[in-house]
């Protein structure tokens, strides 16, 4: 097998590669902060959003003087953007990000640095002079692998009772600095205790058996990983990544898919999609490239990514045999796994549950097999009339995974591609097989999550979640949507966002975004952002519905800002400050409108919140509570009505 010689090298030159300037700007009125752990090298990033003070007229405090106001301390939100939004960081994508986990990995003493790449294909690519102009220039280290007989997975450490720095990092990150925020409220003034109670109020949730914690501790993280209910996707060859966790007892996460195709995109564009995706909240990114220079594209993405990177290795393996599925071999696939593991891929989607006997079950479907990986393996099974090498060599795959700490994302190759096919025999048979394979992986202390559908109408979503929890022993579920209807091409980020919010509530740990281009074309940067924002909404709505501790703080802060006409704070506390501000400024562009007590929806005389504030002012002036003030106000208006002739309509 010869390494591919690119025919598009001139389109991307490593020497002129540059960061997307839009991705490195701090979000409005926000700054990057770092919360330190038990050692100085555990520095957990968060985004601090500063707010304006509440004017006296809204604060509820007695007293006079324009200087009196109620402070609104900054709130803290989960931040996936890595150093890109930190003005103090020096970003050069030709050098990649700092390897922040290297010392932790070295300190464990169970890995070794290899003299050369283990993959035949990787060595061919490294030696190919035609690739010199596009090759990532900043990697000055050799890959690592577990020492002989060692297991380097976070699950293995967890089962040995070891709390790793990654686990402590995650515990701090999941708590979102909530304790510090509430303390800042209590210390903010005479109304501090009342304000803390107001901002921390949250509706009780329905968590469907999830084990949510008031405070996440490193020990809780360790226990969940040991049980297999959560995974930490952190390949030892991706030390640039910031530790994160995927599990239903933690915040719901989202994934963004990027990747080139045979019809378009370049390395520069894919790196820009990655940095754009994490800016808006992508917790992980999957590189699904199927076009030219897959190896080189992936290297650039991994070296510049602070979030875990996932792939579907069978895509690249298929490119190596010119798209002929029947020519795939275990040896070629194994080499691809090692190649990608030594680059630093954090999780592999592997469609090992597509069994030969399940393929005929799809014959009467409306849309057949829609998974690319699933269709590749189904074709291979039929061509050779035997079970796929992914299934028969699964234990050997586990040996590779635990040597680099790559997590499984067991692929749903028979997922439904239409609501007509939802929850059918093929889909659920494969799901149960994935549960069996999970037990095999856990025997090797290899981390596992399970991929899910797909297209499922709302009334069938909970059944899907319940079957997964039972069949897969609560291994994290990772779903594409699901799309709840098939009638809206161009709007499938919405059709799927509905299903994503529901299945996230029922227990899915990570939601794979869908962009408006789904089923229609390759998404660009704008589509990536649209998909991310939609899925951040779905994940947050799921956290609220589950009753995840502290989930409502941001909602409360934005609602308070809205009621107090703090327009800039409304924009900045939202998921997309830029769009919120642009919509407002379309009709009220002047700076004075940022302090106006109305917007263009109702105008100055019909703003419900302004009317409510008028009632409160009237109540305070008359010494009444709000209910009595409304009654007194109605009496006054009634007298006016009679004096004016008791006519429903008056000439003016």
UniProtKB/Swiss-Prot annotation:
Belongs to the ThiC family. It comes from Thiobacillus denitrificans (strain ATCC 25259 / T1). Keywords: 4Fe-4S, Iron, Iron-sulfur, Lyase, Metal-binding, S-adenosyl-L-methionine, Thiamine biosynthesis, Zinc. This is Phosphomethylpyrimidine synthase. One of its GO terms (biological process) is thiamine biosynthetic process. [4Fe-4S] cluster binds at residues 599, 602, 607. Its cofactor is [4Fe-4S] cluster. Coiled coil: none annotated. The gene is thiC.
